[in-house]
Amino acid sequence: MKVTVIDCSVSGHRETYYKQFAQTWAGMGYETSLIAPDGKGIQEAVAFQPVSALPLLPLPAGKPLQKKLVVLRNAVIRLRNLYRLRRSLQRLNPDLVFFACLDDMLPTLAPLWLFNLLLPYQWSGLLVQSALPPYHRGMPDTRPFLRSKNCVGVGILNEYSAKDLETFQRHILLFPDFADLSAPATNYPLLRKLKEKARGRKVISLLGSINFRKGIKLLLESIPLLPKDEYFFLIAGKSSLTAQQENDLRAFGESRNNCLFSLEKIPDESCFNALIAESDLIFAAYKQFTGSSNLLTKAAAFRKLVIVSRGLCMGRRVEQYGTGQTTGEDNAGECSAAIRSLCTETKMNTQAFARYAHEHEVEKLITCFNQISKHIQ
């Protein structure tokens, strides 16, 4: 059986996904090809082809009219991308097309017959953001396309969203939110700088793509509530902030002796893991974030406590497994108290970390892929 894995994202997070998906299918004995931005590091058994898809336009914040126009333009881009992919797939003629991120590849506004015409292959994939607002007929939404006659199963990362999706697709599979656990880099300049500046203080880190949905405002409001001589704060990752927001963030960091803010992309997963390993606490109190994050998997693997927002997927998991604490998204007093408690009072529960890490082991993909393959005709 021939499987083609497809993705169009250039982010490091997504690169981890599509390469691992391709290598898992190949490792299971399937003839596997990968259509994606980067094929470096994949095994020889996977045939690589660069993707020609156009990137989706970012949605403007705080501009509802412009946002609607961008949604419509993205709907057209999605259909054009499927048309381009169809030509590539005709040459490969796979038995299964597997999308590493259905969120970016499924249409949002189109008749189902047109989608089936553009993608006349059996398909499956991962729906990364599966906890979506209530469905309203006629509104831009990927979920109706999960009803396609060619869909043989959909993977999700958020177990709490499964029931709502069963209306659109009966074969819903819970994927592990696996992570690249490469050995931490030892010669990363930012790591050396962190060690020099922290000087033994407790390190609280916000890592990854830097935007205000990551809870930056909450963290900045919490920092002054904690003693400078006991706590050190790291923000590191590629910024999607405006120039003014970046200037304000840098000014805040430079005004204090317990902050290090680096708004450059973390070079690779080994460097990312080095920053996690050097941290005492991982800050992941994201704002209105309904999904899963493999940052929790990394934190568990490196035995690091986390602080997350209460109530949604990540908060429910942290409370269930006991790998950290939750906080209100807009409560700096509660957040700073949780930071203090996690850094000074909470006992390390190694079994809790081990349970969480085991639940999200990459090897569990094989079970999921076997379930998908059973439905291929």
Outline where the language-model segments fall.
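Short N-terminal targeting/anchoring amphipathic segment
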Residues: T4, K67-R78, R84-T108, Q122-S124
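Glycosyltransferase donor-sugar binding loop
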Residues: K40, L207, F232-N247, K265
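Donor nucleotide-sugar binding/catalytic pocket of nucleotide-sugar-dependent glycosyltransferases
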Residues: S124-P133, P140-L191
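Conserved donor-binding/catalytic core segment of Leloir-type glycosyltransferases
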Residues: L194-K214, L220-I223, F233-I235
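Nucleotide-activated donor-binding/catalytic signature segment of Leloir-type glycosyltransferases, i.e.
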Residues: E246-S270, A274
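Short hydrophobic beta-strand element within catalytic cores of glycosyltransferases
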Residues: L281-I282, L305-S309
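A charged, aromatic-enriched C-terminal amphipathic alpha-helix characteristic of glycosyltransferases
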Residues: D330, C343-I376
